[in-house]
Amino acid sequence: MGIYQWRDKKKPSGGKRRYYYKVKRKYAAGRPPTYTTLSAAEEEERKPVRARGGSYKIKAKKVAFAVVSNPKTGEARKARILRIVETPAHREYARRGIIVKGAVIDTTLGRAVVTSRPGQEGVVNAVLLEEQGQKQ
């Protein structure tokens, strides 16, 4: 079991934390993060992963396009992602080109904020920022 999601140490009611000896369970196992990056070419790479309960998550490894919606008109269009401007989650992600929820991206339609979780949903959905939406 590589990544483990449970607490390894348990705090008893009136004392310090000590190791909690319990059998590891399969449902407590985790996976390394996906780190969805911007694809240099127009080809995209996705990987299905079995989730708990037999369902599947689609993990996007490399993406080139985003579904960008305009809040003023309510229409959504497919746009090419040009670059990642900033990522509030972690400064290093923008430098490495990793797309996460909340990241600000430059698209062919303008600057937008990512609203989906590409590492778990397999698609990049974004909403145009207000200053860009007024110019169009």
Curated annotation (Swiss-Prot):
A single Gene Ontology CC term: ribosome
PROSITE patterns for the chain: RIBOSOMAL_S8E
GO biological process, any: translation
Keyword list, A-Z: Ribonucleoprotein, Ribosomal protein
GO molecular-function terms, A-Z: structural constituent of ribosome
Alphabetical list of InterPro entries matching this protein: Ribosomal_eS8 (IPR001047), Ribosomal_eS8_CS (IPR018283), Ribosomal_protein_eS8_arc (IPR020919), Ribosomal_Se8/biogenesis_NSA2 (IPR022309)
Family to which the UniProt record says this protein belongs: Belongs to the eukaryotic ribosomal protein eS8 family.
Subunit: Part of the 30S ribosomal subunit.
Name of the protein in its database record: Small ribosomal subunit protein eS8
Source organism: Aeropyrum pernix (strain ATCC 700893 / DSM 11879 / JCM 9820 / NBRC 100138 / K1)
Gene name tied to this protein: rps8e
